[in-house]
Amino acid sequence: MSKLSHQQQRRIHNHRQNKLAAGDRADAALVVAHLGYQLIVDDHGEILAADWRQKLGAIAVNDRVLITRDQPQHAIVEGIYPREKTLYKQHAGKLKPVASNIDQLLITFAPVPDWQNALLDRFLVAAHQAHIEPAFFCNKSDLFDAQTFAAAENRLAIYHQLGYRVFYGSIYQKTGLEELTHWLSGRQTVICGQSGVGKSSFIHYLMPDIDVWTQAVSAARGFGQHTTRNARRYPLDAHTAIIDTPGVRGFSLTHLQHSEVVSGFPEIHQYTHECRFNDCSHQHEPDCGVQRALERGDISLERFNSMMQICAEREV
């Protein structure tokens, strides 16, 4: 077969660019797993391994991409359709997308291992910056007795007051999950949380035929078992998916400006307009509206300290 002429190559390139610019996603494939060195894409129900043009930069799970097939079961990603609502992580000193085109973030934790509200706050800031809806899921609620449940409710009271949803349930006992499942329906949801809180068990609960999916991914890879160390998308139905991000305990926030971090704490941010200085750090400046609110007890000291810790990290 003869090689394409420069004119033919340019015509093909321009056609692809026009499709991407127009947002014509009818032919788009979906990135369902990123294995670091290789992508797995869903091309209208067919699972394929894929490489990508390095000039495209980093690719995220749930990206809509334009592909060409260089082999019957292998593709090349030629372009990325415009992204909506993207979460990022820091990797090797660079900011890279974790997942794109997402609707909401499910922050998962459990009484064992115990959680830290500071970690929950980091996830909330990431959700705020991505303009996605966050909610909390406290798994292993069967481990609570009346006293420890009351203590947990007290620790989470600030989030209730701020209007965030908090779901309680037990994957092990399959109780308290109906409302949460309804919240997930029809949405693209990233699930996050520290190891041992039951994320994998929850995904297995939501997707009973998960083994079929992982076998399809393994077949596309051509060898071995599907990795659990990289982000991947689990389709629950045609309109619903869970995106797991193993190893990401806290999305990177170091790229955010000080004001962007503060805006992720809305109950604190509302007092910044009372500060004398526009660039107030809310620590030692005179006439600081945030400090006055803190002294009055109008904002949580724990939340304030959490915010200042995130701000300090970005200055290192």
From Swiss-Prot:
Subunit description: Monomer. Associates with 30S ribosomal subunit, binds 16S rRNA.
Cofactor(s) for this UniProt protein: Zn(2+)
Region (Disordered): 1-20
A Pfam family that the UniProt record links to this protein: RsgA_GTPase
UniProt-listed PROSITE patterns: ENGC_GTPASE, G_CP
Domain (CP-type G): residue spans on this chain: 92-251
Binding residues annotated for Zn(2+), in chain numbering: 275, 280, 282, 288
Ligand binding (GTP): 139-142, 193-201
Basic residues bias (residue ranges): 8-18
One MF annotation (Gene Ontology) recorded for this entry: GTPase activity
Cofactor binding note: Binds 1 zinc ion per subunit.
Taxonomy of the source species: Bacteria, Pseudomonadati, Pseudomonadota, Gammaproteobacteria, Cardiobacteriales
GO biological process, one term: ribosomal small subunit biogenesis
Subcellular location: Cytoplasm
Main localisation: cytoplasm
EC number annotated for this UniProt entry: 3.6.1.-
Function field: One of several proteins that assist in the late maturation steps of the functional core of the 30S ribosomal subunit. Helps release RbfA from mature subunits. May play a role in the assembly of ribosomal proteins into the subunit. Circularly permuted GTPase that catalyzes slow GTP hydrolysis, GTPase activity is stimulated by the 30S ribosomal subunit.
Keywords per UniProt: Cytoplasm, GTP-binding, Hydrolase, Metal-binding, Nucleotide-binding, Ribosome biogenesis, RNA-binding, rRNA-binding, Zinc
UniProt keyword annotation of RNA-binding present: yes
Gene Ontology cellular component annotations, sorted alphabetically: cytoplasm
Protein name: Small ribosomal subunit biogenesis GTPase RsgA
Protein family per UniProt: Belongs to the TRAFAC class YlqF/YawG GTPase family. RsgA subfamily.
NCBIfam families assigned: ribosome small subunit-dependent GTPase A (TIGR00157)
